[in-house]
Structure formats: structure tokens, C-alpha cells
């Protein structure tokens, strides 16, 4: 059922310096999420800045400012850190690769403990999200089990381009989670570039992340 097997290794990103996604709510631009890639001989680093705010009658009703860093060595995540302010509430997560115990040590605002190495950081630059059964929240460190279903192949128009994509549904497998904590995303994947190009979800309206620029 899954038709993604071309794994993203840092090599895949060696010629890419950055990607920029624009964020829309109900088709209105509200902010951005940018990822910057830096590859040295041994390490591959991804830094992220996400910034958006939703206004109603000129008053900010929802906002997120987030900074993150992922470090990989030989294709293994060895460190992740992020700090987020969501509506004046601070969220954080720090993940260490524990080589001896072959797991992750997680210190987050909503989870402190260990996680197995199957876990992927839930950031949209990484299409391995579509191959994984479990992810770590890049904002709070919580571990979320997920299922990914291939829906169809289609052609979409994104900005000025028409692209052939594969559409997936990614959702939480734990039905007991409160609705606002559940993963439930439609994801459009460009197999040719091995990149997620669009994400859509519903939460008090329709949200979309759209891949605008690849440098």
C-alpha cells in the first residue's frame, strides 16, 4: 500500500540549502515555516523557524513562534531541540540519542522519558514521516503513534506550477486521544523530488502548509 521507499538520507539534501513553506488558514496567508540545511563531512543539521499568527477583528487569537535544530550523524538522529511560544505559553523539547541503550532520551514540556529509535521528529521537511508508525512532537516531545494511508495519485496546482503528486492521510492510531491532540493530516507528496509539498488539516477552520521555495 505504501509507495514510498526512497529513503531520505542527508545526501538527498546535499544540494539543497533551504526550503520555505507558507502557512494559510482558510486560504489566508498567516505565516511561514522555513528549514535550513547544513551538511558537513560527518553531520547533517536542519534548523527551523516557524512563525504565524491568526487575527480576528485585528486581535491576535492564536500565534506560534518556534525555533528548532535537528542533528543527524550517519543518518541517525543524535540531537533535537526546539523552543516554542504558543499564545504566550512556552513549550520545549530536547531529544538525545542514547547509544548505549539504543533509544532516545526525551525531555519535553508534555513528555519526559524514553522513545524507541523508530520515532521521527514530526517536521514537514522529512518525508520519512510517511514511512513511520510513530513520531515525536517537534513542539512538546509527546510520542504519537500514527498510521499512513495512500489515497491516490493526482495532479495539483501549487503556486504557478502543476505537479504530479501522491496523496496520503496521516492520522493518530490512538482513538482515545482528545480530538485536538490527534494527528489528522492530508499530505501531498512529490515523489520526483522526494518532498512533501502540501499539508492540510482542520482545526477551527482549514489550515494548509504549502511548499513555496526550494533553494
Where are these regions (language model features)?
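Hydrophobic, well-structured mid-protein blocks that either form specific transmembrane helices
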Residues: 82-122
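Acidic, serine/threonine-rich low-complexity disordered tracts
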Residues: 8-97, 128-215
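Short, small-residue-biased leader/transition segments that mark boundaries at the very start
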Residues: 1-4
Amino acid at each position: 500500500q505504501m509507495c514510498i521507499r526512497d529513503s531520505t538520507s542527508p545526501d538527498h539534501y546535499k544540494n539543497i540549502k533551504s526550503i520555505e513553506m507558507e502557512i494559510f488558514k482558510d486560504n489566508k496567508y498567516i505565516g511561514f515555516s522555513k528549514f535550513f540545511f547544513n551538511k558537513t563531512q560527518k553531520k547533517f543539521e536542519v534548523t527551523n523557524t516557524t512563525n504565524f499568527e491568526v487575527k480576528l477583528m485585528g486581535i491576535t487569537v492564536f500565534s506560534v513562534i518556534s525555533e528548532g535544530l535537528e542533528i543527524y550523524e550517519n543518518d541517525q538522529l543524535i540531537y533535537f531541540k526546539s523552543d516554542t511560544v504558543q499564545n504566550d505559553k512556552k513549550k520545549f523539547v530536547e531529544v538525545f540519542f542514547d547509544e548505549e541503550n539504543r533509544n532516545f532520551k526525551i525531555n519535553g514540556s508534555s513528555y519526559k522519558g524514553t522513545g524507541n529509535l523508530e520515532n521521527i521528529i514530526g517536521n514537514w521537511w522529512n518525508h520519512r514521516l510517511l514511512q513511520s508508525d510513530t513520531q515525536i512532537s517537534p513542539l512538546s516531545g509527546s510520542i504519537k503513534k500514527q498510521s499512513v494511508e495512500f489515497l491516490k495519485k493526482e495532479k495539483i496546482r501549487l503556486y504557478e506550477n502543476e505537479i504530479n503528486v501522491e496523496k496520503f492521510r496521516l492520522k493518530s492510531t490512538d482513538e482515545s486521544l482528545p480530538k485536538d491532540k490527534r494527528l489528522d493530516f492530508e499530505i501531498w507528496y512529490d515523489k520526483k523530488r522526494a518532498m512533501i509539498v502540501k499539508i492540510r488539516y482542520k482545526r477551527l477552520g482549514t489550515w494548509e502548509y504549502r511548499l513555496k521555495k526550494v533553494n
